Curated annotation (Swiss-Prot):
UniProt keyword annotations, A-Z: NADP, Oxidoreductase, Riboflavin biosynthesis
Reported function: Catalyzes an early step in riboflavin biosynthesis, the NADPH-dependent reduction of the ribose side chain of 2,5-diamino-6-ribosylamino-4(3H)-pyrimidinone 5'-phosphate, yielding 2,5-diamino-6-ribitylamino-4(3H)-pyrimidinone 5'-phosphate.
Gene Ontology molecular function, alphabetical: 5-amino-6-(5-phosphoribosylamino)uracil reductase activity; NADP binding; oxidoreductase activity, acting on the CH-OH group of donors, NAD or NADP as acceptor; protein dimerization activity
Pathway: Cofactor biosynthesis; riboflavin biosynthesis
Identification of the protein by name: 2,5-diamino-6-ribosylamino-4(3H)-pyrimidinone 5'-phosphate reductase
Enzyme nomenclature, EC number: 1.1.1.302
Subunit structure: Homodimer.
Reactions it catalyzes: 2,5-diamino-6-(1-D-ribitylamino)pyrimidin-4(3H)-one 5'-phosphate + NADP(+) = 2,5-diamino-6-(1-D-ribosylamino)pyrimidin-4(3H)-one 5'-phosphate + NADPH + H(+); 2,5-diamino-6-(1-D-ribitylamino)pyrimidin-4(3H)-one 5'-phosphate + NAD(+) = 2,5-diamino-6-(1-D-ribosylamino)pyrimidin-4(3H)-one 5'-phosphate + NADH + H(+)
Positions that bind NADP(+): T57, D61, S82, T83, A84, N85, V131, G153, A154, S155, I156
Species lineage: Bacteria, Pseudomonadati, Aquificota, Aquificia, Aquificales
Family recorded in the similarity comment: Belongs to the HTP reductase family.
NCBIfam families noted in UniProt: rib_reduct_arch, ribD_Cterm
InterPro entries recorded: DHFR-like_dom_sf (IPR024072), Rib_reduct_arc (IPR006401), RibD_C (IPR011549), RibDG_C (IPR002734), Riboflavin_Biosynth_HTPR (IPR050765)
Length: 224
């Protein structure tokens, strides 16, 4: 499969949590990051062709997904959303800041898609009921997105991990414990369940940026 080079990037607590509780905005935990950590995050954004989050992240966090703490271009924003249920006032639909692609399915209401297009976003249909990432990734590659930063959340991260179509994972470690059984972690989904199916990583680099430990991992058993 021709696909972009994929980098999952996230802040995580020591116990691997992304938020304080299910349904909470990740911006609360991210408020613990210092400016150097934000610079690190935005330096990656400035180097990639595209950036992706799920529509639940858009609804909860309303991110802009632009480059502000570093110099460089804004990446193309890609939002997979089976029903195209992205709020029409979402920051990602402000296409004056950066281009946006909404990846959706045949079941998305046509009138909804027209409203999104009127705001300047591009719509691509890849799938019947659910967004088909096996179709989406080659389509993004054909559109010139050779490198893709995935900022989650847990469900989107699982779509890449379970298909083994992720090349790197970069983590900003926050020195806190969140706890909780149902709090989203770095990767959601049903899990691999068997030892032989696990995704294997190799530590490529680790360093301190500001007050945060950064780890950068290379995926060993990926599929290109």
């Amino acid at each position: 499969m021709e696909r972009p080079y994929v980098i999952i990037v996230s802040e995580v607590s020591v116990d691997g949590k992304l938020t304080l509780y299910r349904g909470a905005s990740s911006k609360e935990l991210m408020s613990l990051m210092d400016e150097e950590a934000y610079k690190y995050l935005h330096e990656i954004r400035a180097k990639v062709d595209g950036i992706m989050v799920g529509c639940e992240t858009v609804r909860t966090d309303n991110p802009s997904l632009t480059v502000r703490y570093a110099k460089g271009k804004n990446p193309v924003r890609i939002i997979p959303c089976s029903t195209a249920n992205v709020p029409l006032d979402a920051n990602v639909l402000n296409t004056k800041e950066a281009p946006t692609i909404i990846a959706t399915t045949e079941r998305a209401p046509k009138e909804r898609l027209e409203k999104i297009k009127e705001l300047g976003a591009e719509v691509i249909v890849v799938g019947d009921e659910l967004v088909d990432f096996d179709k989406l990734l080659p389509e993004l590659y054909r559109r010139g997105i050779k490198s893709l930063m995935v900022e989650g959340g847990a469900s989107i991260n699982w779509e890449f991990v379970r298909r083994r179509v992720v090349d790197e994972i970069r983590l900003i470690h926050l020195p806190v414990i969140v706890g909780g059984e149902n709090v989203p972690t770095l990767v959601g989904g049903e899990g691999f369940k068997k030892l032989k199916n696990l995704l294997h990583l190799r530590l490529r680099s680790h360093f301190v940026r500001g007050k945060q430990l950064i780890t950068e991992w290379e995926v060993v058993n990926k599929i290109r």
